[in-house]
C-alpha cells in the first residue's frame, strides 16, 4: 500500500488499463500477491444495508407494491430498532416503485431508512428531490472497462461528470452515496483515489457526509492477506480509510458471488474498516447474486458477540413469505433458511443427535430461528435415525424421548427396510412416518401437538 502523504493526481490516460495480466478474458482471472500485510481496523459500529428492492428486484420478476411493503415491514421487524439493518434502497423509475417507496416512508420507521438509487444523471436526481428522500446511491462506474468501453469517455470527463452530480446533490441537501462500480478492476491510484479525494473535499466544504460504496461488480475481490490491488478487499478498504481518509461510517462494501467469495469478502471489508455491508435477502441479485442479508446477520453475531435486540426468527418467517407468497424457490440446503439446512440424514449423525443435538447442530436453531433440528429417514438411518426422527419431529423432551432400542422402533425400521429393498430411492416422508407412529406408538402423538418441519 502506497504512502498516505503522496499527492495522488488523476491519471488521465489515453490508453485504458484493463489489467490484462490479471484478467486475461480467455483464461480464469489471476491473483497477484505483493505480501504486504495490512492491519485490521474493525469499526466500533458496523451495519448491514439492504438492496432487496434494487439489485435483488432487477434480477427476478418485479415485486408487486404490496410485496415490497410487506418485505420492508419484515426487515423492520427483524431489525427490531437495533439499528443493525440501517438502510434499504429503492428504484424510483416506475410509478409502482415510487408508490411503494412512499408507503414505506410513511411507515415512519427509523430502521431501515429508505434511500434510493439513480444513474449519473441530474434528471434522475430530480426524482429523489421530489420524493423527499435524504440519501441516494449514484452509479459511478470507476474501471476503465466501464469508462472507456461503456461510457465512451475519458477518465477526466467521467470524473468531472460524477463530481458535478455529487455537487448537485449536496446543493439540494441530499446525501450522495457514490457507488464505485467495478472497483476490483479499477486503477485504484490513478482514478479511484484522486476521485474520492475530491469527493471528501466537497463533503467537508458542504458539511454533509458523502458515502463511498465499493462495488465488487463481478465478484472478483479476494480476502487474502498480501494480495495486490485491484483485487484485494483489504487493500481497497484500507486505501479508502488511510489514503483518502474516508471515515469508516462512510464506507460500504457491495459484493457479488461469482467466485463463491461474497460472504468472506464482505466480512473482510468489515474487519478492515468498512462500517456497512450491502446485502439482499436470500442473496438474490444479478447473476450469482449479492451477499445474503441473513448470512451477514450471523457474521455480525459472531464478530460482535450479539445481535442486540434483533428478532432472528423473522428470518424464517420472511423466507417462508418468499416461498409461499412470491413463489420463490429457496434451495433446500441454503444456510439458515433452506428446508434442509439443519436436517440430518446420516445414521451415525442421527445417533449423535439422539444422544445430544448439540453434537450435530450448529446452535439452538429452534430457539433462535424457530427451526428445530430434523432427522430425515432413509435406507442409511438405522434405528438411531428413526428414533431421532420421532424425538425431533414430535419435539419430545427428557423422559418422553424414545430410545433407539425400543421394540416399536424395530417395527418402523422393518417397514423402512422393505421400502428400499423394493427399489425406493427417495427419503421417507414425514406423513408416512406419522402414519406408522400413529399405529405402533399412538401415545407419542397424544403427548404433544407440536411438529418440527
UniProtKB/Swiss-Prot annotation:
Keywords: Cobalt, Magnesium, Manganese, Transferase. Disulfide bonds: none annotated. PROSITE patterns: PYR_CT (PS50991). The keyword Transcription regulation does not apply. Coiled coil: none annotated. It catalyses: oxaloacetate + acetyl-CoA + H2O = citrate + CoA + H(+). Can also use magnesium with lower efficiency. This is Citrate (Re)-synthase. The lineage of its organism: Bacteria, Bacillati, Bacillota, Clostridia, Eubacteriales.
